[in-house]
Amino acid sequence: MWRDTAAMPEYGRLEGDVRTDVLVIGGGMAGILCAHFLRQAGMDCVLAEADRLCAGTTGNTTAKITSQHGLVYDGLLRRFGAEKAGMYLHANEAALARYRGMCREIDCGFEEKDAFVYSLDDRGKLEKELAALEKLGFHAGFTDKLPLPFPVAGAVRFERQAQFDPLRFAAAAARGLRAYEHTPVRRLEGTSAVTDRGTIRAEKVIVATHFPFLNRHGSYFLKMYQHRSYVLALENAANVGGMYVDEAAEGLSFRNAQGMLLLGGGSHRTGKQGGGWRELEAFAKRHYPRAHIRYRWAAQDCMTLDGVPYIGPYSARTENLYVATGFNKWGMTSAMAAAMLLTEMVQGKRADDAPV
């Protein structure tokens, strides 16, 4: 769907050896934003992508820009305390604000929308989330009336969140970068990246490859798992007016784009059984019988065990190597927050061990 409305810039593959200040590995939203901000700061930066820019998860997003990541704040407050939970909230609010500012100059269908997390049957969960947000100084609303085709126990509302066309935005941010497509990094030797047709020698490296590929350090394969979800883009369906997601992991999400309803769900842990396309198709047929499926796609997301992305030094033993991963299905604000933090780190404006 997004690929039909965006013309991504094209870059050739690396041929020969190059040097740079910073190498960014991975050409999704996080990698593009890192390279974009470093270029703006006057640093020499190379972006290496194994396929095409935005060929992975970024091209298969529902593109909600929100600091409301499910009912996350009650858990963060209990697990990490008010200071760190507040840091998570403020980092994502800052990411939303950065998108808002950039989108004034980029034609990408940016629209402010209220975001809602609803529960079918557990009002208590919603009340706990509202109490946690109040402790963090954030005003959220409550409603039990949503324009969805089923009753809910209620919903937590964040006002003035946003949605956009992610590839039109990414295409604008990626123009003018020193980038190489079809250039998979086979291994790292310190901060030098070996590819099929040349080596990129950098002072610092940011790994933004969805799942970190360097298994010798960081043990990310032990700290994350994969979750698969599905989306139908329906013509002649309802205009729901906002962005809605079930607090349950297997629930449904709704938002409109390009005159269509994006219906998400059927989620399951990768390798396990789940509802998949059949569940979404049955729901659409039952509740939107006149709708027509224009597009369909699936996405696979990296989920962290504690619900917090990994953004910062790759590991304690890898100097000048940084990572952004584990966005827990909230890739748009997480990618922006990661780019803002990591580009400050590589410029020395933020200590590597500084709190987020």
PLM regions with names:
Residues 1-4, 71-78, 97-169:
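Flavin (FAD/FMN) cofactor-binding and adjacent substrate-gating region
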Residues 1-22:
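Extreme N-terminal leader/targeting segments of oxidoreductases
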Residues 18-47:
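N-terminal Rossmann-like FAD-binding beta1-loop-alpha1 element of flavoenzymes
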Residues 40-60:
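Glycine-rich FAD pyrophosphate-binding loop
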Residues 60-91:
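Glycine-rich active-site loop/strand segments that organize a redox cofactor
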Residues 130-133, 155-204, 208:
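Helical element adjacent to the flavin cofactor pocket in flavoenzyme catalytic cores
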Residues 188-256:
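Flavin-dependent oxidoreductases
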Residues 248, 277-279, 288-356:
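C-terminal catalytic lobe of FAD-dependent flavoproteins
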